[in-house]
Amino acid sequence: MASHASSRIAKVLVANRGEIAVRVIRAARDARLPSVAVYAEPDAEAPHVRLADEAFALGGHTSAESYLDFGKILDAAAKSGANAIHPGYGFLAENADFAQAVIDAGLIWIGPSPQSIRDLGDKVTARHIAARAQAPLVPGTPDPVKNADEVVAFAKEHGVPIAIKAAFGGGGKGMKVARTLEEISELYESAVREATVAFGRGECFVERYLDKPRHVEAQVIADQHGNIVVAGTRDCSLQRRFQKLVEEAPAPFLTDAQRKEIHESAKRICKEAHYYGAGTVEYLVGQDGLISFLEVNTRLQVEHPVTEETTGIDLVLQQFKIANGEKLELIKDPIPCGHAIEFRINGEDAGRNFLPSPGPVSKFHPPTGPGVRLDSGVETGSVIGGQFDSMLAKLIVHGATRQEALARARRALDEFEVEGLATVIPFHRAVVSDPALIGDNNSFSVHTRWIETEWNNTIEPFIDNQPLDEEDTRPQQTVIVEVDGRRLEVSLPADLALANPAGCNPAGVIRKKPKPRKRGGHTGAATSGDAVTAPMQGTVVKVAVAEGQTVMTGDLVVVLEAMKMENPVTAHKDGIITGLAVEAGTAITQGTVLAEIK
């Protein structure tokens, strides 16, 4: 169970970072609950750390060294006196072993039961549950595949395209679509690598892929007493690399029969899985109207605000109540009021095919006004590294109708100013005026691969030539110190605070406004003359060539990873590989020469 009969949530530790940590901390404050933040070293100055009532350092620079470390998080809970843990989304939110460890430590787990997470998190088991619940399904492998040969065999039997998908995770990570038999081997290996990095397990299964489908989902809320409601639908069809960029609620252009099938099958699936908590049942809707079950996300979704804005339901507060063992106050599915659209503000360069773009945020000026909400994990002065997800914030707009929401979105996006690094705001500004998204009274034409296959990308690559800031000359400096892992802030005279030549004292680090990084005027093309260069900052996860190897134009040279996304770098001409300068695990910066082709 998520809670013990004799206990209620008294103090919440949020085992996450960024905007979702801020969201949960604010909900805790609304519920008059003290909150505890945890943070990796790169996040020591993050907003969620300051907003919480207490903050504890996890140490480490990567997810594995911090937010994925069971022991460090449970230790922080013990030190802080927190009796409940909210996992947010991503990281450990869908890790059944962590949920069980929290419960075994005598703490309240704000989420579904470990068994439900295990059953629905395993996408193969989830398909079996969906089948028992008589949910609509496309053909797929009954169990995870052992190798690429099994994937090829499935494709030969059922045809392409096929989807190779991580069995233990979601969010588009560890998912690849093969449209030819020849590319299956490479895509299978890439899916396994991504799944291993993101979820700690690399098993994958395969299913038929519906071409040009819509992505529609149902927001479920279920208590521990068997009561289940669907708080509405969402459309999340605007994606790149199978990761969502724009979401809206309620899902537009569904027939009454389709909406009924989604609501009812979502409830049947959750009942079959003995599910409680907030969760999302996802579907694909084909061009012909065919509905197919996709997966269940056993957590709060990134896009939950659009449901909140159209129902008036605070989904995080609902999670708190369910974990306390309370019954749902809702007795039937709410009727949505108005229309809401969410835009993920990612640190990616839309002008360069959405390449990850780590860097400093020298200016962050979000919009305000009627119908505008912002969920953010950054601010002016934040530094966005390549270790974590690329999302900086979420802009949510609400209107009485879909047309009004789109109009407010255009205004809000025009007001949104972010400087210092590339973001997807230029894409959002373009797409809200695109006829494919606007549609007519009956339909629109966007689908899950619309961005890659149909959108006319005329966005210029990001170039930032801002000068560096002058040195900070404030008379006071705030020093961050850690005492037994607990974060404290002390204000000291600047000359005393800067007495240490390294800019910090042995106990902590000085809070300074990060200087905007001056970027060159090049567009980050992966090639120049003979050189094959890195189009972005990241880590080499695969080297596909050897010194002296002959390659053809388009052949894979290396695979880079940044912000949890893999990006292939290919040969720009025919020739022989010389001067191969990297290996798997090498950290590189944008423009690094990886090899030459002579």
From Swiss-Prot:
Compositional bias ranges of the Basic residues kind: 510-521
Name of the gene this protein is made from = bccA
Segment Disordered: which positions? 506-531
> Example GO molecular function term?
metal ion binding
Q: Which residues form the Biotin carboxylation domain?
A: 8-452
Query: What Pfam families does the record tag this protein with?
Result: Biotin_carb_C, Biotin_carb_N, Biotin_lipoyl, CPSase_L_D2
- Enumerate the catalysed reactions: N(6)-biotinyl-L-lysyl-[protein] + hydrogencarbonate + ATP = N(6)-carboxybiotinyl-L-lysyl-[protein] + ADP + phosphate + H(+)
Q: Where is the ATP-grasp domain?
A: 127-324
The source's superkingdom equals: Bacteria
Q: Which residues bind Mg(2+) 1?
A: E282, E295
Which cofactors does the annotated protein need, by name? Mg(2+); Mn(2+); biotin
Annotated residues for binding of Mn(2+) 1: E282, E295
Family matches, as CDD domains: biotinyl_domain (cd06850)
Q: In which pathway does it act?
A: Lipid metabolism; fatty acid biosynthesis; Lipid metabolism; mycolic acid biosynthesis
Q: What does this protein do?
A: Component of a biotin-dependent acyl-CoA carboxylase complex. This subunit catalyzes the ATP-dependent carboxylation of the biotin carried by the biotin carboxyl carrier (BCC) domain, resulting in the formation of carboxyl biotin.
**InterPro entries assigned:** ATP-grasp, ATP_grasp_subdomain_1, BC-like_N, Biotin_BS, Biotin_carboxylase_complex, Biotin_carboxylation_dom, Biotin_COase_C, Biotin_lipoyl
Record-given protein name: Biotin-dependent acyl-coenzyme A carboxylase alpha3 subunit
Subunit structure and binding partners: The biotin-dependent acyl-CoA carboxylase complex is composed of AccA3, which contains the biotin carboxylase (BC) and biotin carboxyl carrier protein (BCCP) domains, and an AccD protein, which contains the carboxyl transferase (CT) domain.
Q: Which residues belong to any copy of the Biotinyl-binding domain?
A: 522-598
